[in-house]
């Protein structure tokens, strides 16, 4: 609902300006243009509001990610490369989170609370991301004509948690500081996870075309 969105966006903006600890229900209600009773009726206390705000922002990030990464074609497309699609999705996801202005600002103001909220309290956000990734896994295997993993959701959760960990705990390897290094890591580690270990051998055999649809 429009009121819920207004409240969540007001909360995120207020958190980024003064921090979570210093944000009151009145601050959020005033910024959203609603009364305090409406805010409590919709979201209850601060913990529920914070969790809902995280999930709302995760949805916006995932929407932006889907805009940046090409869809998997329904039919044959000689120019579509599943491995490149996975590399692009991973690299863009890492970049979006690392460059996220609101997240970085909130980490500066309330680093400990954000760390807790984005780890212990990130269950719903990770589940949301995992569902999106699992759908992409199914689509990629459909396009290639290969058997998907027994449980694409497990793989979706694994990749979501991998990206989440790499972004929230930078340093110490792997090196993802440049687009080139992030793409290299995605090609050698993430692509085999998503498409199967044989993709590395297939790509090596077809260096000029990368990984296309297997011929029938």
Roles of regions detected by a PLM:
Residues 32-43:
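Short hydrophobic/aromatic patch on the recognition helix
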Residues 1-31, 47-51, 56, 72-80, ...:
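Basic, helix-initiating cap at the start of DNA-binding domains
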Residues 95-99, 135-139, 156-177, 189-200:
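Amphipathic C-terminal alpha-helical segment
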Residues 52, 66-100, 156:
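Hydrophobic alpha-helical connector segments
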Residues 1-2, 72-75, 144, 196-216:
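N-terminal intrinsically disordered/low-complexity leader segments
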Residues 103-108, 115-116, 146, 175-176, ...:
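Short, hydrophobic secondary-structure boundary micro-motifs
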Residues 62, 84, 105, 114-145, ...:
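Amphipathic alpha-helical packing segments from all-alpha helical-bundle domains
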Residues 7-15, 61, 65, 93:
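Short hydrophobic clusters on alpha-helical segments that form packing/core surfaces
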């Amino acid at each position: 609902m429009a009121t819920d969105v207004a409240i969540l966006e007001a909360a995120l903006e207020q958190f980024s300006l003064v921090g979570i600890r210093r944000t009151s229900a009145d601050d959020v209600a005033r910024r959203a243009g609603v009364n305090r009773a409406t805010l409590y009726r919709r979201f209850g206390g601060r913990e529920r509001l914070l969790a809902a705000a995280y999930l709302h922002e995760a949805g916006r990030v995932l929407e932006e990610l889907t805009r940046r990464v090409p869809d998997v074609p329904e039919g044959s497309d000689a120019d579509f490369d599943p491995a490149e699609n996975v590399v692009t999705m991973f690299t863009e996801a890492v970049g979006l989170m690392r460059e996220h202005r609101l997240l970085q600002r909130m980490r500066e103001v309330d680093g400990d609370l954000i760390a807790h909220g984005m780890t212990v309290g990130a269950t719903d956000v990770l589940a949301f991301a995992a569902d999106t990734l699992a759908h992409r896994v199914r689509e990629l295997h459909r396009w290639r004509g290969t058997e998907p993993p027994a449980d694409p959701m497990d793989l979706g959760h694994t990749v979501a948690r991998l990206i989440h960990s790499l972004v929230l705990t930078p340093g110490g390897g792997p090196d993802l500081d440049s687009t080139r290094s992030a793409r290299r890591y995605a090609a050698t580690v993430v692509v085999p996870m998503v498409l199967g270990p044989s993709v590395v051998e297939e790509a090596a055999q077809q260096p000029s075309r990368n990984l296309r649809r297997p011929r029938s």
